[in-house]
Regions:
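Mid-domain catalytic core of redox enzymes
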Residues: 240-354, 496
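A conserved FAD-binding loop/helix module that cradles the flavin
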Residues: 456-483
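A glycine-rich dinucleotide-binding beta-alpha-beta segment and adjacent secondary-structure elements
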Residues: 175-185, 402-462
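Helical element adjacent to the flavin cofactor pocket in flavoenzyme catalytic cores
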Residues: 198-251
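N-terminal glycine-rich phosphate/pyrophosphate-binding loop and immediately adjacent elements
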Residues: 2-128
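C-terminal segments that line or cap access tunnels to active or ligand-binding sites in enzymes
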Residues: 309-417
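Active-site-proximal substrate-binding core of FAD-dependent oxidoreductases
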Residues: 481-497
């Protein structure tokens, strides 16, 4: 007899891990497949000289709101420690620096004091953000939001962030500050609905944190759950081909890359929408065209360095450099000089337990920058590519030293990763957040043309780690059914188990 499961989940990034824990905790039999040798996707860490470094997950928001509630639902909150993270924005052209306080009200007050002529417009802006937050049920799981639809239709769905700021007559560096978190979802202000931006910006601006041990803390909690709940989790394995569809347009079997076969009731993809096309049988032309019309977000070039213990200018937190206040130019790649670079300073522990200071820098990039090496793979790229990486890392370091001169001579390179590195190890396309969240665009989510196939792929509803977890919760509700969903969420949030 072939192995059988209720849910076959493809991928163990944050969406796959969340779906696996939700379904298994609710009593479903789950098999999760990961094509890599280890789980976690962008949540993974790697090590150089015994120092842990983040792959793609650097910080999150909303620990006091929905993200913390999601950890309770998954039964892993006790395994996760949040570290409050400061935010400083540096405009490289003017030299102006803004230290932004945590908390929406504190941020509003701070910006009004810095830009008094725009105070009325700022009050309107933040009132709109609060309205979006208050009317998004998924952000209020403890007060009945768990039993409402995921995202309601709001008036803010029908105006872009850029158009709203135009209406408010907000320009220059203030506009850059309000659009700054666009680099955390990858969609330009002129494309993203204000509501989608507000949902991301509110959590990050209100409660910016990194996790102690980074995304590895979530991966470790997931692996513990796979043992506790007897989850069938397989690495280095994916689907080779699917069985035949029945008259009901459902498929219930698959041959795996390890040569085994498996039967299932439901199958869930968590990959980039275009990766789904490679596996999905009988994808019609209309469906294929819809997916191929999606636009990818930017990628990141990431550089890592060790910082001497006696270095001046080291302050834990996020130091963000913007070469322009025009985030459309930054995130569309229309101006090669328009860049956003985040520098995350943190204290980590080496494998031997000793503390060390690190900085992780991530700068927005686009495929054209590395197109000459598209047909190469990690470990087999030419000297010109290595020179590009070294030059890029040096430029990112020099930009930082302009504004933090006390670090000169105190930074020691550990590693770097281009958009191609991320393409080879994670997403098949190297995009940091999957597809862009354009206004009036219907992203790929839920049921697919094969009637028992579903997707909770990158940016299905909301981008980022918290967005992916909430997307997974919505799909769990659809497949588990309302009765199981209500009982599960009520029990978890009341007991905190």
């Amino acid at each position: 007899m072939k192995p059988h499961c209720d849910c076959l989940i493809l991928g163990s990034g944050i969406s796959g891990m969340t779906l696996t824990m939700l379904f298994a905790s609710a009593g479903f039999q789950v098999t999760t497949l990961e094509k890599s040798v280890s789980p976690g996707g962008a949540m993974q860490r790697f090590r150089r000289q015994g120092i842990p470094l983040d792959t793609g997950f650097h910080f999150t928001g909303g620990m006091t709101d929905c993200f913390g509630d999601m950890l309770d639902l998954l039964g892993i909150r006790d395994s996760i420690e949040a570290v409050p993270t400061s935010l400083t924005v540096q405009f490289t052209e003017s030299g102006n620096r803004y230290e932004l306080p945590a908390g929406i009200s504190a941020l509003e007050q701070s910006l009004c004091e810095r830009f008094p002529d725009n105070a009325a417009s700022l009050h309107r802006y933040f009132q709109a953000e609060r309205e979006v937050f208050d009317n998004t049920p998924l952000f209020h799981l403890r007060s009945g939001g768990a039993f409402a639809e995921g995202l309601p239709d709001l008036k803010w769905d029908h105006i872009t962030l850029g158009a709203f700021l135009d209406e408010l007559q907000i320009h220059g560096e203030l506009r850059g500050l309000l659009c700054g978190m666009c680099s955390c979802h990858g969609t330009p202000p002129g494309e993203i609905p204000f509501s989608s931006h507000a949902r991301i910006d509110y959590g990050l601006s209100n409660d910016l944190v990194r996790l102690r041990n980074g995304g590895e803390a979530l991966v470790s909690a997931f692996l513990h759950k796979t043992e506790e709940l007897d989850i069938d989790f397989r690495t280095n394995t994916t689907v080779r081909k699917f069985g035949e569809a029945g008259s009901d347009r459902k498929i219930h079997s698959a041959e795996l890359s390890d040569g085994t076969e498996i039967e299932f009731e439901h199958l869930i993809f968590t990959q980039h929408p275009r990766e789904i096309l490679h596996l999905l049988p009988s994808a019609g032309n209309a469906f294929r065209s819809r997916v191929e019309e999606f636009s990818d977000t930017c990628g990141f070039f990431t550089a890592y360095a060790l910082i001497d213990d006696d270095a001046e200018d080291f302050q834990e937190g996020l130091f963000s450099c913007l070469t322009t206040s025009d985030l459309d130019a930054v995130l569309l790649g229309t101006d090669p000089k328009a860049r956003t670079t985040g520098y995350l300073f943190s204290t980590e522990r080496r494998n031997d337990g000793t503390p060390c200071r690190t900085v992780t820098a991530f700068q927005s990039v686009f495929p054209a920058e590395t197109a000459a090496w598209n047909d190469t793979v990690t470990g087999k790229r030419p000297l010109e590519y290595q020179e590009y990486k070294a030059r890029k890392a040096a430029e990112i370091e020099e930009q930082l030293l302009r504004f933090k001169p006390g670090l000169r001579g105190k930074m020691h390179s550990l590693a770097s990763a281009s958009m191609l590195t991320f393409r080879d190890w994670l997403s098949g396309f190297g995009a940091a957040y999957g597809i862009r969240q354009k206004m009036d665009q219907h992203n790929l989510f839920g049921r697919l043309p094969v009637r028992n196939f579903y997707t909770a792929s990158q940016s299905s509803i909301l981008p980022g780690a918290a967005g992916s977890m909430l997307t997974s919760l919505v799909l769990f509700r659809q497949l588990a059914g309302e009765e199981i969903y209500r009982k599960f969420i009520t029990a978890r949030l009341e007991s905190g188990k």
